[in-house]
Amino acid sequence: MSASQAASSPTQAQTQAQTRAFVIAWFFTVIFYFLEYAVRSSPSVMISGLEDHFSTSALGIATILGVYYYTYSSMSLVAGAALDHLGAKRSVPVGMAILGLGCLLFSVPVVLAGDIGRLCQGAGSAFAFTGAVYLAARGFPARYLATAIGATQCVGMLGGSAGQNVVGPMIERGLAIHTFWVGIGIIILVVAVLLYISTPKEQLGTHIQEGGFSSLLKPYEVVFSNPQSYLCGIVAGLLFAPTTIGDMIWGVAAFQKDLQFSYHNAVVIASMVPLGWVFGCPLLGWLSDRIGRRKPVIIGSAAVMMLAGAQIAFHPLPISARLGMFIFGVASGAAMIPYSIIKEVNPDNVKGSATGGINFLVFALTALLGPVYAHRIGRGTGNVPNLAVHFQRGAMFWIACCALAIVVSFFLRETGRAAQPQAVSK
């Protein structure tokens, strides 16, 4: 008996060691996700500095920043397939290294370097959340997986808030734009090395090796042949855009230049939206599961976003802009619910690809809306006769996006348990 026990214990110890290694790798990938969101949101607190850095206008800066979403959306499709084909060790650290190199390139005061750097940032960032979910699924028991993914999402949102609320005061105290981007680039590259060292090698299935990389793209045919997938992407994209573009690119400039807030107050107010995400994402997800329905939570949250946007722009009630932006951020957490719906309206064997598919659709829509907002409204920030009316026009643009999200939501299939036949039959 002792001989068999001795033979089995090394295998068990090896399994436990590998599980711990996956948890450690997940931890570093969560840091990756935090830093990725900080990189995404921090340009909003340095628009004027970036204009001087690249010797271009605010519209030119918006164009440079917007190219991030071109590569982020397209690489979202590649990231999931790369994880399945190559494993985490040979894909996620590479994505993080690309993000770090993109930050270093962004520090070069040349528009072309800024464009390429931002493209690299978007491409590398696409591996963060997907990689964290992949590693969490291998490091945590099934009963803790949802908690691990929820914690990952919250940390990412904190990164978005830190990119404004922490970086803003640093810039205000005189930190040079060049120094910031070199510094964060080096930090990201160091964490990428630690991630590579900590991530264990995996035994990939023979079906993956035989099928080749192209076979991993076939599930996307299933996802993109389902009209509900597009509806999920449109709804999530319309709810994400007011935060990713309206707040994380134009928020600080709008409050500072249109409403004449101090730089410090503008940064604090803008940072309330990603801080609201930290609470809104898990809260609204829990509420959706609790009532067993998806659509009412999406529609109700979009309506709250519209009311909060109207309050911020027209202030009919004695509610501060800071609180209004926080409420807006909490409600925008409903943008994550279509990520659950797209998995529920597609077959079980393509759920991973469904996540990549909705990421692609969401940020492709973001990439389309960004230039529209920049040309129609953003370019006039601080440069029009009636600044208050200009701010209100910007708010109405995002309120219209939320209204359109509500309309499209009515065409979504209700996938909550309360709508299932067994839930209503007795």
Task: Describe the residue ranges of each PLM region.
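Extracytoplasmic gate region of multi-pass secondary transporters
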Residues: 43-45, 226-284, 366-374
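Paired small-residue
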Residues: 102, 112-120, 319-327
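Symmetry-related core transmembrane helices of the 12-TM Major Facilitator Superfamily/SLC fold
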Residues: 178-196, 392-410
